[in-house]
């Protein structure tokens, strides 16, 4: 347990460094210490980066017991959008550790919180969930709404994660989102389209 002292130090630079190493190595057994560190960092509004790495580490090391706590954090008034996205990706990632469970994804889609929706969609991509036709169509009906398409090319919009995951999808569904995406004629989007059209994961929008 090489990183306990850093995680429990209360010092943001040390906490962030430890979380990044745990994330990189997917080191198991740090769950309680990651929880403790996250509790401390959530009290620091400007510590979004350490919060992000702690949440990614919790997800990547399968700390499923943390889901109720993470959901409670979503109820807070959090000043940084990145933290909402990080919370959402961690929750959806953990809830799909063993079996497919899209309930939180749909809760997020109903939330009208851009960052939360992006995080939930990121988990679909990162867990390589092959959406059933009904789920694909429902999720597409949300992520293609104008409010989720703002600032194309400047932010990672929710639909980009569904596009990136579409290399796994049946041809009909993949073509549907590719056709939708072509309208933007944006370099990053066009690169993802090229990847999925070849049936491969270009790993261009992975969060961790």
List each model region and its residues.
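Structural detector for internal amphipathic alpha-helices that build alpha-solenoid repeat scaffolds
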Residues: 13-28, 48-64, 82-97, 117-130, ...
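Residue-level signal for functionally critical sites in structured catalytic/ligand-binding pockets
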Residues: 81-84, 105-108, 115-118, 139
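Terminal, low-structured helical/coil segments at or just beyond the last alpha-helical repeat
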Residues: 179-208
């Amino acid at each position: 347990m090489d990183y306990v002292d850093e995680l429990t130090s209360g010092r943001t630079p040390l906490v962030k460094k430890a979380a990044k190493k745990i994330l990189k190595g997917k080191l198991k057994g740090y769950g309680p210490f990651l929880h403790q560190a996250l509790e401390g960092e959530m009290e620091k509004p400007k510590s979004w980066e350490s919060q992000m790495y702690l949440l990614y580490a919790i997800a990547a090391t399968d700390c499923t017991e943390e889901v109720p706590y993470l959901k409670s954090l979503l109820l807070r008034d959090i000043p940084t959008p990145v933290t909402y996205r990080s919370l959402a990706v961690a929750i959806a990632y953990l809830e799909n550790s063993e079996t497919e469970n899209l309930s939180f994804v749909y809760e997020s889609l109903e939330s009208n919180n851009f960052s939360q929706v992006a995080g939930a969609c990121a988990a679909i991509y990162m867990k390589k969930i092959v959406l059933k036709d009904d789920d694909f169509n429902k999720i597409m009906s949300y992520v293609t709404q104008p409010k989720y398409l703002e600032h194309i090319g400047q932010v990672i919009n929710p639909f980009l994660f569904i596009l990136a995951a579409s290399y796994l999808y049946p041809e009909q569904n993949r073509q549907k989102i590719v056709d939708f995406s072509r309208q933007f004629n944006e370099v990053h989007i066009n690169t993802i389209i090229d990847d999925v059209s070849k049936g491969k994961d270009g790993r261009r929008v992975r969060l961790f």
